[in-house]
Swiss-Prot record:
Its main location: cytoplasm. Residues 392-523 are annotated as: Regulatory domain. InterPro entries: 2-IPM_HCS-like (IPR050073), 2-isopropylmalate_synth_dimer (IPR013709), AIPM/Hcit_synth_CS (IPR002034), Aldolase_TIM (IPR013785), LeuA/HCS_post-cat (IPR054691), LeuA_allosteric_dom_sf (IPR036230), LeuA_bact_synth (IPR005671), PYR_CT (IPR000891). The gene is leuA. The lineage of its organism: Bacteria, Pseudomonadati, Pseudomonadota, Gammaproteobacteria, Enterobacterales. It holds the Pfam family LeuA_dimer. GO terms for biological process: L-leucine biosynthetic process. It is found in: Cytoplasm. GO terms for molecular function: 2-isopropylmalate synthase activity; acetyl-CoA C-acetyltransferase activity; manganese ion binding. Homodimer. Belongs to the alpha-IPM synthase/homocitrate synthase family. LeuA type 1 subfamily. Pathway: Amino-acid biosynthesis; L-leucine biosynthesis; L-leucine from 3-methyl-2-oxobutanoate: step 1/4. NCBIfam families: leuA_bact (TIGR00973), PRK00915.1-1 (NF002084), PRK00915.1-3 (NF002086). This is 2-isopropylmalate synthase.
Length: 523
């Protein structure tokens, strides 16, 4: 009987480090819910000691997620571990993941310490974490460049201290697959108490072999794989979980292991992460790229038509990609839209049917037929923008031409007040942004602008993703419309609402901190 490989997702911790703009607490929760639906065993959702905002988001996710184990990261520092436990304690069960560097280079130049001191510190911190939970994971940072004998000493001591998962990271993506397999095998040979812990791996893609390293480690005995959806992460990224999961499934004949992942949710989870994180998936990306199941060669097309297995080792349906696209019209009722969303795998909690149906009718009136990809895009945008809005686009008009300076007039609802402004700009989008900035008085600098078609043909929806810099912080906004200028305006309004909400959250955190201080003084 095959053994289970535990899937540990770090999209919301290590993966987020690659983003140009930090995710809001609501966006993180959306991703966490998608990961739970896909069936990840463990999700690492943040580094609570790093900021009050991260603490709050970890706490919110820990309170909400029920079917996956929620985990938080902590250095081998007392405060880190205590704060992580404080954020996680609202969960029924949780994991604390603590780490310290073990390679000679890191010990000498970063920690300015010795291996013996590192072991002593690791043991103390694992024991401290065990005071809060039985589920403690310990990582040997830069394990890939740590001599195996040294690594074995650290691992044995951490297990004796109470760590139930030992993670072996290739922190800088340096190790080759055969080397990494050798490290795992070497630990099994050298560590007498290794049967008391799960051996985990965490690989990076600097040399393009993160997935290969993880699979080689599993073949050598590792039983947990850490990674991120779509491989997002620092530098060249993390191990792409969807690739590991499907490799284990497709090649079960030689891997002889399995995961508990609902692989039919892979495609939708991948899309959720891509859209929320504003990181488009390359067309040639394995498993989830738009070209992953495309066949352009005549020979291949003929072979697939005769038997799909001639050129397909897995099906689009196996990852939840339904290739049958149905269309709805403005005559389709609310029940028909809801039924189609259910057929595509969406639950009632994934969208607001009232908001979705209103947006559907507006789009159907414009383009006649609404396809599955239109519905999914509308559902995503409405989910992103369902929170109370301080700013709302009331009206806009643009005049521009090949030789004229673009002029825009904009009306914006700011709370209960309607404000209007006009401005010139270098093109219609810039003119609208100048007018909006005049209305709000927000000092924002546009640092990224992306336009992607959601669908096919001249009436396809255009999704605009922007990133702006505001007082040293970056914020992401998204807009969707059949008109590019309108979607650009909506994206800017979305950004401004995100900035406004972030300021409100900051005020609330400051209020709580002040109340805490006042209570201390009273006592």
């Amino acid at each position: 009987m095959s053994q289970q490989v535990i899937i540990f997702d770090t999209t919301l911790r290590d993966g987020e480090q690659a983003l140009q703009a930090s995710l809001s607490a609501k966006e993180k929760l959306q991703i966490a819910l998608a990961l739970e639906r896909m069936g990840v065993d463990v999700m690492e959702v943040g580094f609570p000691v790093s900021s009050p905002g991260d603490f709050e988001s970890v706490q919110t996710i820990a309170r909400t997620i029920k079917n996956s184990r929620v985990c938080a990261l902590a250095r081998c520092v007392e405060k880190d571990i205590d704060v992580a436990a404080q954020a996680l304690k609202v969960a029924d069960a949780f994991r604390i993941h603590t780490f310290i560097a073990t390679s000679p280079m890191h010990i000498a130049t970063k920690l300015r310490s010795t291996l013996d001191e590192v072991i002593e510190r690791a043991v103390y911190m694992v024991k401290r974490a065990r005071n809060y939970t039985d589920d403690v994971e310990f990582s040997c940072e830069d394990a890939g460049r740590t001599p195996v004998d040294d690594l074995a000493r650290v691992v044995e001591a951490a297990i004796n201290a109470g760590a139930r998962t030992i993670n072996i990271p290739d922190t800088v993506g340096y190790t080759m697959p055969f080397e990494f397999a050798g490290i795992i095998s070497g630990l099994y040979e050298r560590v007498p108490n290794i049967d008391k812990a799960i051996i985990s791996v965490h690989t990076h893609d600097d040399l393009g072999i993160a997935v290969g390293n993880s699979l080689a480690a599993v073949h050598a005995g590792a039983r947990q794989v850490e990674g991120a959806m779509n491989g997002i992460g620092e530098r060249a990224g993390n191990c792409a979980l969807e690739e590991v999961i499907m490799a284990i499934k497709v090649r079960k004949d030689i891997m002889n292991v399995h995961t508990n992942i609902n692989h039919h949710e892979i495609w939708r989870t991948s899309q959720t992460v891509s859209q929320i994180c504003n990181m488009p998936i390359p067309a040639n990306k394995a498993i989830v790229g738009s070209g992953a199941f495309a066949h352009s060669s005549g020979i291949h097309q003929d072979g697939v038509l005769k038997n799909r297995e001639n050129y397909e080792i897995m099906t689009p349906e196996s990852i939840g990609l339904n290739q049958i696209q149905l269309n709805l019209t403005s005559r389709s009722g609310r029940a028909a839209v809801k039924h189609r969303m259910e057929e595509m795998g969406y639950k009632d909690t994934d969208y607001n049917i009232d908001h979705l149906y209103d947006a559907f009718l507006k789009l159907a009136d414009k383009k006649g037929q609404v396809f599955d990809y239109d519905l999914e895009a509308l559902a995503f945008i409405n989910k992103q923008q369902e929170e109370p809005e301080h700013f709302r686009l009331d009206y806009f008009s643009v005049q521009s031409g090949s030789s004229d300076i673009a002029t825009a007039s904009v009306k914006l609802a700011c709370g209960e007040e309607i404000k209007a402004e006009a401005a010139n700009g270098n093109g219609p989008v810039d003119a609208i942004y100048q007018a909006i900035n005049r209305i709000t008085g927000y000092d924002v600098e546009l640092v990224k602008y992306d336009l992607n078609a959601k669908g096919q043909g001249k009436d396809a929806l255009g999704q605009v993703d922007i990133v702006v810099n505001h007082h040293g912080r970056r914020f992401h906004g998204v807009g969707l419309a059949t008109d590019i200028v309108e979607s650009s305006a909506k994206a800017m309004v979305h950004v401004l609402n995100n900035i406004w909400r972030a300021a409100e959250v900051e005020k609330e955190l400051q209020r709580k901190a002040q109340n805490k201080e006042n209570n201390k003084e009273t006592v």
